[in-house]
Design a protein with these regions (language model features):
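A glycine- and small-aliphatic-rich helix-loop capping segment at beta-alpha/alpha-beta transitions
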Residues: 23-27, 56-57, 107, 143-156, ...
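Glycine/threonine-rich beta-strand-loop-alpha-helix active-site module
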Residues: 109-113, 117-120, 124-131, 138-189
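Acidic, glycine-rich loop-and-beta core segments that form the ion-binding/anion-interacting portion
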Residues: 196, 201-241
Length: 291
């Protein structure tokens, strides 16, 4: 054999994609020492996505301190490609459910503010292309916190700011002010790994389907769904965009909807996004074996 491409996903909970690929490569080289072996660590947009993209682009980890779902400071990292143009962000690294103790899980009170802080940091470092994985969140704030970190301001009917973006404040939002939004956002491209098709609200929406997994009881679910309906109407009135029933708008507690409405994001299945980012179709050309 002259060329082998290794593209192995992680073995959940026991072996990362990178290590699995290295092991396979060592075995092949021990039998075919002259063979060209290309390792493409891979992920489906969930666990391991960030590290795979950093490695595939010869990028670097960027350490950052940001706010977790309960607005506590936490150290984490994201990635930037070697050319400095693309940022790789895993929402779960700062807004994820495992960061909230089981007894404090309440999507009425959690926020995506930290995810917005990471996006803002990457903007200030010059990134204009973003690849974001939004699985595993602890939130149902429809990305309100994220948007606040990027400069959006939300107020109620009396013109008073609603406070930190949490699920409980969605019902209060009546006005959106974008005058202080980070100026670089208009020139950015956002691609989001999203493997669900749920609408923004309703029986199949963010609150009813996902909020119970994040600690919500029946009363909370109903309140969150009402908040999402209100926010969707304010978005429609302000931007002219109706995200109510857009497939994927309900992902990550409504985060998908805000990414669509405010950042003009493109939602893609995680594996499709990863294969495109890795230039997979070109890498496997002329391969004798693909693992």
């Amino acid at each position: 054999m002259k060329k082998v491409v290794i593209a192995i996903d992680s073995f959940k909970g026991c072996l990362p994609s990178v290590e699995a690929g290295k092991a396979a490569a060592e075995g092949i080289r021990s039998v075919y020492p002259e063979c060209e072996v290309i390792c493409l660590p891979i992920a489906d947009g969930g666990e391991g996505m960030l590290d795979v993209l950093i490695m595939a682009t010869n990028g670097q980890e960027v350490p950052i301190s940001a706010h977790d779902p309960l607005m506590r400071w936490r150290n984490t990292y994201y990635g930037i490609s070697e050319n400095g143009e693309t940022a790789f962000i895993e929402m779960a690294s700062i807004s994820g459910l495992p960061l909230v103790p089981p007894e404090r899980r309440n999507p009425m009170l959690t926020t995506t503010y930290g995810t917005g802080e990471i996006i803002r940091d990457a903007l200030e470092r010059g990134c204009r292309n973003f690849i974001i994985g939004i699985g595993g969140s602890a939130t149902n704030d429809a990305g309100l916190g994220m948007l606040q970190a990027l400069g959006f301001r939300f107020s109620d009917k009396e013109g008073k700011e609603v406070g930190t973006g949490r699920g409980e404040v969605l019902i209060k939002v009546a006005h959106i002010d974008s005058t202080c939004v980070h100026p670089a956002l208009n020139s950015c491209r956002f691609t989001v790994a999203c493997d669900v098709q749920n609408p923004f609200y309703g029986p199949e929406g963010a609150a009813y389907v996902f909020a119970p997994q994040k600690g919500a009881d029946r009363e909370m679910v109903e309140a969150l769904d009402a908040g999402l309906q209100n926010f969707a109407e304010v978005i429609r009135h302000t931007t002219g965009k109706d995200i109510s029933h857009h497939p994927g708008a309900g992902a990550a507690g409504g985060m998908g909807g805000s990414l669509l409405a405010f950042l003009n994001a493109e939602l893609k299945p995680g594996i499709q996004l990863m294969l495109e980012a890795l230039d997979f179709s070109n890498k496997i050309k002329s391969a004798d074996l693909i693992i």
